[in-house]
């Protein structure tokens, strides 16, 4: 797709110009300098198509009130001066995408909004503004608003931004009956809406179970267990009007459920298959740029930074940001490994896992396979083994890897220990343990026939009636193996 031509063929209705006209101008300018990605363009074009369909109305009065309200919010700038919040053109569009389109009876069209862009693009800052609108200005009344966050010690970042607006404005503070910064909750006395923050780790699902909340916001969704959004939406399912807003940046867990969700949303965007009640904003490099791994080019990482890279007009490139991040990009591309992984995921908003050249790939590992097993190795006299043990307390799998050096002939035949050998190689045997009651669930979820390995490489635990890993059972099995096969553990590493 020629983005530069396609964006110029879009038509902005006159009645929408005051709300998204600046964003459209920014898109045209960014396309001219190759800093507009196809995904972001498609998100905007889809919004225009939905409006043009005449199925929905645009709530111009409500959106004017929303922008007027957000403009009244006060923040402290880098120089320590109080300033009223000014939204970037792209942020105005996001607000219109979430709240602007209404059904004929006045209800919100969107009940799920997914916002994906690079780090340092004001996502948490914007969400804190969204929370203030939801708490005090939206149509919701006496509702529980869930803020789910999962960034470890930074879990309160969005809530802190929320409370800073209150601290900076005594008039806004008067609208709250209580703000508890320690327990992370607040209540608006005008609407009765209450905001509660949950950290999505450990027993978060249990904490959220049973909540029948209409409104929820998730900060850094792609760091959450995928069950968290599902649990929240379960609590919203029976409401006619509900809203879930999530924001995130790409991660490095390629192939995970969250990654699959990301890919599915993108695929549906490109196939025009997204439901009308889903608003997606996705700022990322184009596919061909990712495939070419041109991560050091500003025309790659710049497409994922619609706020960070530009001045308030949304298209004039900030010189100091361009220079700073160009330097970061060059350094990451030179260093590779985890440095490149960090830059690609955080600033290119692309899913990427570091390639460690000291490790082989899965296919290379398969090519190292031999036609003899552990029992034959022991029979040949190899009884000195290294054991690496990973005992899991939270996951459904514990594993032990057994390693020893063996000798082979030129044709790859296993030789007896201490025989003259053409080469020596590292023989590896892996044993894993899984709770008995979790086997079928993993077969269905992972689409992998674990049953083919039960009793040989995979052993089932009956701890807690088959629901948990039974560590003593693992040690007993290893001890039995030691006694029967007469092997010695030279190195035993419990991690």
For every predicted segment, state its role.
Residues 187-191, 404-488:
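Nucleic-acid-processing active sites and adjacent nucleic-acid-binding tracks
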Residues 2-389, 480-484:
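Phosphate/NTP-binding elements of NTP-utilizing enzymes
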Residues 128-136, 395-411:
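Acidic, metal-ligating active-site segments
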Residues 391-393:
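Non-cytosolic beta-sheet module surface loops
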Residues 365, 432-434, 495:
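Active/binding-pocket-proximal capping segment
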Residues 159, 213, 229-233, 257-264, ...:
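Composition- and surface-driven signal marking solvent-exposed, interaction-prone regions
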Residues 121, 490-495:
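Acidic, metal-coordinating catalytic cores used for nucleic-acid/nucleotide bond scission
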């Amino acid at each position: 797709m020629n983005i530069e031509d396609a964006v110029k063929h879009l038509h902005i209705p006159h009645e929408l110009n005051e709300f998204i006209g600046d964003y459209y101008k920014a898109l045209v300018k960014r396309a001219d300098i190759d800093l507009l990605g196809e995904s972001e363009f498609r998100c905007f074009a889809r919004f225009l198509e939905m409006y043009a369909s005449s199925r929905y109305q645009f709530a111009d009065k409500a959106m004017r009130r929303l922008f007027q309200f957000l403009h009244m919010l006060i923040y402290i700038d880098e120089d320590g001066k109080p300033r009223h919040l000014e939204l970037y053109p792209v942020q105005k569009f996001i607000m219109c995408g979430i709240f602007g389109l209404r059904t004929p009876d006045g209800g919100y069209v969107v009940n799920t909004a997914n916002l994906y862009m690079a780090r340092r693009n004001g996502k948490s800052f914007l969400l804190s503004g969204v929370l203030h609108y939801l708490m005090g200005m939206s149509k919701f009344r006496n509702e529980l608003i869930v803020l789910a966050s999962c960034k470890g010690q930074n879990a309160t970042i969005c809530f802190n931004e929320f409370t800073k607006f209150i601290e900076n404005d005594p008039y806004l503070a008067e609208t709250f009956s209580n703000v508890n910064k320690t327990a992370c909750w607040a209540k608006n006395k005008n609407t009765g809406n209450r905001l509660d923050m949950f950290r999505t780790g450990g027993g978060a699902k249990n904490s959220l179970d049973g909540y029948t909340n209409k409104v929820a916001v998730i900060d850094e969704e792609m760091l959450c267990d995928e069950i968290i959004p599902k649990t929240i939406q379960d609590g919203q399912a029976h409401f006619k009007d509900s809203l879930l807003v999530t924001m995130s940046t790409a991660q490095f867990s390629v192939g995970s459920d969250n990654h699959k969700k990301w890919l599915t949303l993108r695929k549906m965007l490109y196939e025009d298959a997204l439901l009308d009640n889903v608003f997606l904003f996705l700022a990322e490099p184009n596919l061909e740029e990712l495939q070419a791994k041109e991560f050091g080019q500003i025309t790659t990482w710049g497409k994922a930074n619609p706020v960070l890279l530009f001045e308030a007009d949304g298209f004039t490139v900030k010189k100091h940001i361009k220079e700073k991040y160009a330097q970061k990009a060059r350094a990451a591309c030179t260093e590779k490994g985890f440095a490149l992984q960090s830059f690609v995921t955080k600033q290119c908003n692309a899913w990427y896992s570091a390639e460690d050249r000291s490790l082989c790939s899965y296919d290379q590992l398969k090519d190292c396979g031999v036609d003899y097993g552990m029992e034959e190795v022991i029979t040949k006299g190899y009884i000195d083994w290294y054991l690496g043990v990973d005992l899991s307390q939270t996951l459904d799998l514990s594993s032990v890897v057994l390693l020893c050096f063996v000798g082979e002939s030129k044709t790859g035949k296993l030789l007896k220990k201490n025989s003259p050998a053409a080469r020596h190689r590292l023989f590896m045997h892996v044993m894993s343990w899984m709770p008995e009651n979790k086997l079928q669930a993993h077969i269905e979820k992972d689409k992998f026939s674990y049953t083919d390995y039960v009793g040989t490489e995979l052993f089932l635990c009956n701890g807690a009636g088959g629901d948990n890993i039974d560590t003593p059972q693992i040690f007993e099995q290893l001890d039995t193996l030691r006694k029967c096969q007469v092997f010695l553990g030279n190195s035993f590493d419990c991690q």
